[in-house]
């Protein structure tokens, strides 16, 4: 057996085929948020090509599938500027199907009233209006894209969204495909050294009896089992950590919806050696159990 260059190839050696990237076509009504959607996907780690002529879809898909290129997720923003563009886009999608490339189509839409208002606010004509009114251009575009909208995998009506809300919606639709989930830092600290400025959430655990006053525990830290058991067995400590963990869950969900990548939760005690350390370790353990990417940091441990 020979390779593409005519050289003999060992038939026992399997040549890995190039892995085709996931392909998403972003199209829809002008002014409905195609570019905003593309930018949101870029933030999620997609490789985005904006305003690509439809006839370039097939060559681009082939290029990114070549060995050595690492573009696992490709999004292409395509608009329809006339009957020719629409025919080229439908033809390109059909050609991709014959090559066993099955792109998803995301169609952006909005009401006529909203689209008119958006074009008027930026003082730009609709690409299909010509010498007519904006609403006439919108009507022409709707007639051209009706079939494409019907075959779309996802249709998003952006009428009630601003730019940030649309970006958040796109992120929620594709959040399982993100390169990074929300990453949480759980920190312990001592109040006598100051409250950490970068913590979104600060919990004061000085209500727990201080192991410092227990001779056997004083030289140990909250990372040691005897201290951790002492702290977690204290009256109110178990209830506190249960409720605190539960209160953070909807907060973290909200952060993910807002595309926030990092969060810091801090526990403080007097010196940052016993109680705060034990509680930080416990919350970190629970978050890991729930699949949350987390690191535990003890800011002031060892300062005494």
Swiss-Prot record:
GO MF annotation list: ATP binding; GTP binding
Coiled-coil intervals, chain numbering: none
Residues reported to bind ATP: 28-35
The keyword GTP-binding is assigned to this record: yes
Gene3D superfamilies found in the cross-reference section: P-loop containing nucleotide triphosphate hydrolases (3.40.50.300)
Protein's UniProt keywords contain ATP-binding: yes
Origin: domain of life: Bacteria
Keywords: ATP-binding, GTP-binding, Nucleotide-binding
Binding site for GTP: 79-82
Any Pfam family matching the protein: RapZ-like_N
Function as written in the Swiss-Prot or TrEMBL entry: Displays ATPase and GTPase activities.
Family under the similarity heading: Belongs to the RapZ-like family.
Protein name: Nucleotide-binding protein Krad_2934
